[in-house]
Amino acid sequence: ARRNIFPVIDNFGHLLGIVQLDDLREDMFKHEKYGHPISDYMIQPPDKILEHESIQGVMEKFEDKHTWMLPVVDKQNRYLGFISKSRILNAYREQLVKIQQ
């Protein structure tokens, strides 16, 4: 899957925010923009998923925030990765198929 959202982390791995490729695309090849910090493009994610959060809690966050991709962090806000709503739904679908067989 192609990803359009990227994490911005500090030297300790803490999540500072996210950057959406669509927000960068227009400026990516403009030499006058090369010196600009990534923080100029950074936004806060709609929410974060804690690494030990229940699937039910994760799905509620996806529904509440009307989003398909959220960052996963540990208790110290260190970035661990992204999780997508579609990946969870696909895994759920696979489990249903196994149960029905």
Language-model segments: residues:
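Cytosolic regulatory domains of K+ homeostasis systems
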Residues: A1, L15, H36-M42, L50
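The conserved cystathionine-beta-synthase
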Residues: A1-R3, I9, M28, K48-W68, ...
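Helical hairpin unit composed of two closely spaced alpha helices linked by a short loop
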Residues: P7-V8, G13-L21
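Bateman (tandem CBS) regulatory domains
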Residues: Q20-D23, Y34-P46
